[in-house]
A protein has these predicted regions:
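Local cysteine-cluster metal-coordination motifs and their immediate loop/turn environment
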Residues: 94-99, 143-155, 238-259, 300-316
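Iron-sulfur-associated redox domains of electron-transfer enzymes in respiratory
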Residues: 1-233, 237
Length: 358
């Protein structure tokens, strides 16, 4: 069940300032002990996550930033993992990041009882390097990341405790849509006004979802046609320098001990020479194609199509384009959608005797 609350814009505020005030009230009133939020760098050159426990440190907060800082879900893991202080955290995350957190909860990486997930409706984001331009140019004129242009889930969905709604909301408000008792309690504790969910909300969300589904379907078809026989796959990966940025920023790549840091993928000087002797010639860095194939197999059922992998790639490998051709197809085989529900087991974590593949 959804509960709606009105967070009114005050004194000439825009929605960004109103969302910042919401975080301020959450800390001031003790609704949570800490807030994880996107913070603008000095001069507005970029945006990164910050974890604040005092209201005076919220001045740089940009909860509705049109860019995705890296490591949001990973920071939430660190803030709630066993051994840390028992502090309740309100985390402002994009819808794709919320879906990643849902997957991490299933993998016992995040303690959900200590987190209130706040997720702004997302109209799409630009690359971090372009963030400064959002201050000087029309946001609609800036190119959105491909992952955002084909996003099928632009709202927080079931995984979010509270959506910071702009879709279907009045121009003078943020519509706080709570989906959990924890989210409802948060909205009440900050003094938001309870209202009915307006019919414009469902209509606006449905339009955004339909547009995303259509864009994703078109990209999926194009990607499958391009990569179906593998002919374009290896050339597309030819510029890989195996920096592992894609792996390091991936929100669902959670293993503490990783195959890619073993001798199989990260050979020592001696084993590198042995491989060169056996093969006669050896491309270095080694096993770049195998690296991507292994990563793809490892994360595909949990992938939320956030696009962080492509954004972090220094050589511009079209990873979102590649994943778009296989991500939904693999998940559909298991009747699964990553990040849809915390109660939905991941495909490879349970056994069904009567399992059928779609």
């Amino acid at each position: 069940m959804e509960y709606a609350f009105r967070w009114e814009l005050k004194g000439g505020e825009n929605r960004q300032a109103a969302a910042r005030r919401l975080l301020h009230e959450a800390l001031r009133r003790g609704a949570v002990g800490a807030v994880l939020f996107p913070a603008e760098a000095r001069g507005g050159a970029g945006v990164a996550y910050a974890l604040a426990t005092r209201v005076e440190h919220l001045g740089s907060a940009v909860p509705l930033a049109r860019a995705v800082p890296q490591f949001g879900p990973q920071n939430l893991v660190r803030a709630t993992e066993p051994g840390g202080g028992p502090i309740a955290v309100a985390a402002v995350l994009k819808p794709c990041e919320v879906r990643a957190v849902v997957e991490l909860v299933k993998l016992k990486q995040v303690a959900p009882s200590r987190v209130v997930l706040l997720s702004p409706d997302c109209p799409g984001t630009v690359e971090l390097k372009d963030y400064a331009r959002t201050r000087d140019e029309s946001e609609d004129a800036l190119p959105l990341r491909l992952a955002c242009r084909i996003c099928r889930r632009p709202v927080g969905g079931e995984g979010a405790d509270v959506s910071l709604g702009t879709l279907g909301a009045r121009h003078d408000e943020l519509l706080l849509v709570a989906r959990t008792d924890r989210g409802r309690a948060f909205c009440e504790s900050v003094g938001a006004q309870a209202v009915e969910v307006p019919p414009t909300r469902a209509e606006a969300v449905a339009r955004a979802v339909a547009a995303g589904e259509a864009a994703h379907a078109a990209q999926e078809a194009a990607s499958r046609e391009r990569y179906a026989k593998g002919g374009a796959f290896v050339p597309a990966l030819s510029t890989c320098i195996k920096c592992m940025n894609c792996m390091n920023v991936c929100p669902v790549c959670y293993c503490k001990e990783c195959l890619f840091y073993t001798d199989a993928f990260n050979p020592t000087a001696g084993s590198l020479a042995d491989k060169a002797k056996r093969r006669g010639v050896l491309r270095v860095p080694t096993e770049t194609v195998q690296f991507h194939l292994t990563r793809m197999a490892h994360v595909m059922t949990a992938c939320v199509m956030c696009g962080q992998c492509e954004s972090a790639c220094p050589t511009g490998i079209p990873l979102v384009e590649m994943y778009a051709g296989i991500n939904k197809r693999i998940q559909d085989l298991f009747g699964y959608e990553s990040g849809r529900s915390v109660d939905e087991p991941q495909p490879f974590t349970e056994f069904r005797e009567d399992e059928e593949f779609g």
